[in-house]
Amino acid sequence: MSNAMILEDASRFWIPTPMVSRLRDRIEQCLQCGDTGCVIVGEARLGKTLAIRRILSELSNRSGERIHAFYTHYGQRDTETVRAVFAKIARALGAEVGRQTADKLLEWITLHLADAAQANSTRQVALLIDEAQLLSAKQLNAFAEIYNELVDMKINCSIFFVA
């Protein structure tokens, strides 16, 4: 591949930096200690989204087993409902979302995450939510509902908000 072709598609250009390593280490520390998650904050256009997407497949539990981590992002919408949050998460997990109620979407999400958590001995799964600063307080409570449902199912879930 010529240098011109490499530069033509810069989207695949990636330089792992010490900051990305520290970010991965911090997220894994949360996962391995069983933390419910954390908030990752940084200035705009620093590369948080790219870094998060790159490390998704590298996350592991304290036994070194892979943890399924799911990513979604939010933007400003005219509808700031809990159902909108659940619909966005369900789409990110592969669901075809129609006119389901918030309760049906929540049920689908928790069952999907619970299934994914069975892949490791710690029954653990992670959600990474990008552009979290755009969510209202009411919408943020939707994540507490997901977390609580998973706890009832004996599933360990860590939710990371990137803002």
What kind of feature is each model-predicted range?
Residues 33-57:
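Walker A/P-loop nucleotide-binding motif
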Residues 1-41:
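Walker A/P-loop-proximal flanking segment of P-loop NTPase domains
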Residues 46, 73-77, 133:
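Short histidine/acidic/glycine/proline-rich micro-motifs that form metal-
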Residues 5-9, 19-26, 78-142, 150-162:
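Mid-core helix/loop region of P-loop NTP-binding domains shared across ATPases and GTPases
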Residues 54-55, 141-144:
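Short, glycine/charged-enriched secondary-structure capping and boundary segments
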Residues 59, 63, 147-150:
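Active-site catalytic pocket residues across diverse enzymes, especially alpha/beta-hydrolases
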Residues 62-76:
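Conserved catalytic segments around the Walker B and adjacent sensor/switch elements
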Residues 37-39, 69, 124-126:
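Residue-level preference for the first positions of well-ordered beta-strands
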